[in-house]
Amino acid sequence: MARIAGINIPDHKHAVIALTAIYGIGKTRSQAICAAAGIAEDVKIRELSEEQIDKLRDEVGKFTVEGDLRREVTLNIKRLLDLGCYRGLRHRRSLPVRGQRTKTNARTRKVHVSRSKNSRGK
């Protein structure tokens, strides 16, 4: 298994799909990384040479991924909480932040739902 950005990349998957195992890299960014590294998208990770894996590491290193990205997101939410702005209040109250309706939906954000509503009475 290749190790990129502190994550073991599954070597039985295609390069584009395998890179999405890294937090912060989706399919579009993965395609851009493969194109910049000069790697075909349909090549599996185990078929790559060590030089190609090093190129992938260099390209992934240009982005904020994994722990750094998680830390950045957490700090952004903490900043909103400290400011006391509307979005910060919504985070504090565990309500939807981006204007979604709460009269009917948003149950997963409002309360932890372990079972569906219909199975409660049974």
UniProtKB/Swiss-Prot annotation:
TM annotation in the entry: none
Gene3D superfamilies referenced in this protein's UniProt entry, alphabetically: 1.10.8.50, 30s ribosomal protein s13, domain 2
Record's keyword annotation contains Nucleotide-binding: no
Cytoplasm recorded as keyword: no
InterPro entries, per database record: Rbsml_uS13_C, Ribosomal_uS13, Ribosomal_uS13-like_H2TH, Ribosomal_uS13_bac-type, Ribosomal_uS13_CS
Pfam families in the cross-refs: Ribosomal_S13
Region (Disordered): 94-122
One biological process term in Gene Ontology: translation
Keyword terms, alphabetized: Ribonucleoprotein, Ribosomal protein, RNA-binding, rRNA-binding, tRNA-binding
GO terms under cellular component: cytosol; small ribosomal subunit
An MF annotation (GO) of this entry: tRNA binding
Family: Belongs to the universal ribosomal protein uS13 family.
Biological role: Located at the top of the head of the 30S subunit, it contacts several helices of the 16S rRNA. In the 70S ribosome it contacts the 23S rRNA (bridge B1a) and protein L5 of the 50S subunit (bridge B1b), connecting the 2 subunits; these bridges are implicated in subunit movement. Contacts the tRNAs in the A and P-sites.
Subunit structure: Part of the 30S ribosomal subunit. Forms a loose heterodimer with protein S19. Forms two bridges to the 50S subunit in the 70S ribosome.
HAMAP family linked to this entry: Ribosomal_uS13
Name recorded for this polypeptide: Small ribosomal subunit protein uS13
Source organism phylogeny: Bacteria, Pseudomonadati, Pseudomonadota, Gammaproteobacteria, Pasteurellales
